[in-house]
Swiss-Prot record:
Membrane topology: Lipid-anchor; GPI-anchor
Signal peptide: 1-20
Chain positions carrying an annotated carbohydrate: 30, 86, 96, 444
Positions of the propeptide removed during maturation: 468-485
Organism: Candida albicans (strain SC5314 / ATCC MYA-2876)
Swiss-Prot/TrEMBL keywords: Cell membrane, Glycoprotein, GPI-anchor, Lipoprotein, Membrane, Signal
Lipidation feature positions (GPI-anchor amidated glycine): 467
Organism lineage string: Eukaryota, Fungi, Dikarya, Ascomycota, Saccharomycotina
Protein name: Predicted GPI-anchored protein 27
Localization annotation: Cell membrane
UniProt GO cellular component terms: plasma membrane; side of membrane
Length: 485
């Protein structure tokens, strides 16, 4: 019996704190559940519903929409504001949701709520009565243990604010927000107006600056940039702008479209606070007429009056083709005029030397005069020959050479007869020949002369023709005689 009484006392001892803990855990769990349900309800209100009553996450709406002017649009369309209260499970299941829906028609008019204040007050009274707990514990007496008294103080929660007070607070907050939005709009309008005035002042200041036409500018152009003093008060007073420029207003609008803005004035001067200056630049450039280039033509080189390098090519290409007819006409008229300034100089060397040294060498000197100009008559290269002491000296020698002596012997008479000939030796004939003839090459110092040279260098054209006929007939007769014999 004693053992059973002690066992019952211990069981009661352990069960009482467990019961108290269960009550506390229930209250805390109820609070967390209510908070979670509130959050879920907010999400359900935000997400749109389709016909099947399922939320479409991809079509979620924003909480607050903002217009281009920076003003919130749907701030008065906020989701449900659920009343917070510590409720039991039964009250959470059966209680109705209280929502505050407000719509702003004007600044002072507000919509009424859907829940009456009397219903809300009754719900709060029920919550307070159910949450108050009063318990009394029995006393146990035993022989071994002293009596244990357990007294549990009643737990009462402080009553929350009524729905009327919360509703007033919500309306007050909404009024404050509306007032702030209106003040913000007024400030934005004033600021925009001040910025427009400032831009007009900048354009007019640019139009007054004189335009310099010189390439060198020594003085800096004064820039008239308005400076504004912005005074903002805490009572949302309008912005006061005081431009310091003395430019008349009538000149501002007319000169905006005529002149462009200079970028240096924007960069060098400090802009006013909370301003963004976006000015189009480089819009009034004059287009220059495109210059079409002349088509490139290859330069034409004039080859007339351009001397060649070799004398033989000059005579072959120019003199023989162009001057044969002129010399014929000059010989007929009795006048001999040369068309260039080329002179021939002859020298006679000893017979005992080499064969090449015995030839008559013609040295040609190219003068600075142009081709085609008339020069004095041809001078005979043998006009000054000193036959004394059997010496022949060339008078005009371009290079310093020692005079050469030749022993003529019986050739003096031949020289005299050669000098007394009526024909003259034209210089172009020798110039056209590739190889100089060896006319005076003989061991006996006799003068050799070509028949064809004698024919072409003497007389007129008729005499030349007759000479050729005679020579050709003689050659034919000689050949016939050789065949006969």
């Amino acid at each position: 019996m004693h053992f059973t009484s002690s066992l019952l006392a211990t069981l009661i001892w352990f069960t009482l704190p467990v019961q108290s803990l269960n009550t506390e855990s229930r209250t805390t769990s109820n609070n967390t559940i209510s908070i979670l349900t509130n959050h879920f309800q907010i999400l359900k209100d935000l997400l749109p519903y389709s016909k099947t009553s399922k939320p479409q996450i991809k079509e979620s709406r924003p909480l607050i929409k903002v217009s281009r002017d920076g003003v919130p649009i749907n701030f008065h369309r906020a989701p449900a504001i659920i009343m917070k209260s510590n409720k039991t499970d039964d009250l959470v299941r059966n209680s109705n949701k209280t929502m505050v829906l407000t719509e702003i028609k004007t600044i002072t008019e507000f919509a009424t709520t859907t829940v009456s204040p009397t219903q809300e007050f009754q719900a709060l009274q029920i919550n307070l009565n159910t949450l108050s707990i009063e318990t009394s514990t029995p006393t146990f007496q035993s022989h071994d243990f002293p009596p244990i008294t357990i007294e549990d103080t009643p737990k009462t929660l402080e009553p929350e604010e009524s729905s009327d007070a919360l509703q007033r607070d919500a309306f007050d907050q909404i009024k404050k927000l509306e007032k702030l939005v209106l003040d913000l709009r007024l400030e934005m309008k004033e600021q925009q107006k001040s910025f427009n005035d400032q831009l007009v002042d900048i354009y007019t200041a640019r139009s007054i600056v004189p335009i310099y036409t010189t390439h060198i500018v020594t003085s800096a152009i004064p820039s008239y940039v308005p400076k504004e003093e912005v005074m903002v008060s805490h009572d949302s007073a309008p912005i006061v702008s005081r431009p310091r420029t003395d430019i008349p207003v009538s000149q501002r609008i007319d000169t905006i479209s005529k002149h462009k803005m200079n970028g240096k004035n924007i960069l060098n001067n400090n802009p006013p606070p909370n301003s963004v200056l976006i000015v189009p630049q480089f819009q009034f450039h004059e287009r220059m007429a495109t210059k079409t280039e002349v088509a490139y033509m290859k330069p034409k080189i004039v080859w007339t009056n351009f001397p060649t390098t070799t004398a033989t090519s000059m005579f072959d290409n120019f003199i023989l083709k162009n001057l044969v007819d002129e010399t014929d006409s000059e010989i007929d008229s009795g006048e001999t005029e040369l068309s260039d300034d080329y002179y021939y100089y002859y020298s006679y060397e000893d017979d005992g030397k080499e064969d090449d040294s015995d030839e008559i060498t013609a040295q040609i000197l190219l003068s600075n005069s142009e081709l085609g100009t008339k020069t004095p008559n041809f001078e005979d290269p043998f006009e000054q020959i000193n036959i004394e002491d059997n010496k022949v000296i060339s008078v005009n020698t371009p290079k310093t050479k020692k005079p050469t002596t030749t022993v003529f012997g019986t050739s003096t008479s031949a020289l005299s007869t050669f000098e007394s000939t009526i024909f003259e030796i034209p210089k172009f004939f020798y110039g056209s020949r590739r190889k100089q003839p060896s006319s005076f090459k003989n061991k006996n110092s006799t003068i050799k002369f070509d028949v064809f040279d004698w024919i072409f260098e003497s007389g007129t054209t008729n005499e030349k023709v007759h000479g050729l006929v005679l020579v050709s007939s003689g050659v034919l007769l000689g050949t016939c005689l050789l065949f006969i014999l």
